[in-house]
Each structure stands twice: as C-alpha cells, then as structure tokens.
Amino acid sequence: ATSYTLNEVVALKDVVPEWVRVGFSATTGAEFAAHEVLSWSFQSELSGTSGSN
C-alpha cells in the first residue's frame, strides 16, 4: 500500500473567522478507496489582556 504524509503549519487567524469547524474530505474519482487520518494535532493560544472576556 502507498502511504503519504502531509504536514502544514497555517496561521488560522489569517484565513478563518473566530469560530470555525474543521473537517476532512478525500476522493479518488470513480474508484473506491479507504482514507485514514492517522494523526491530527491542533494548538490554540488565547491572546488578549488578563481579565478580559
């Protein structure tokens, strides 16, 4: 079986709104294939002043 790795760092604050949902999609055209997400990582940091809402 062939295996591919995709690794990308994206500054999401530059491309998405404050609230967002993330999903995955894959296709092979007319053929059947199984796609697996073997690892997923997300890191978030809250910026702002202390005590703000």
From Swiss-Prot:
One of its GO terms (molecular function) is carbohydrate binding. PROSITE patterns: LECTIN_LEGUME_ALPHA. It comes from the Eukaryota. It holds the Pfam family Lectin_legB. Belongs to the leguminous lectin family. It comes from Lathyrus aphaca. Keywords: Lectin. This is Lectin alpha chain. Tetramer of two alpha and two beta chains.
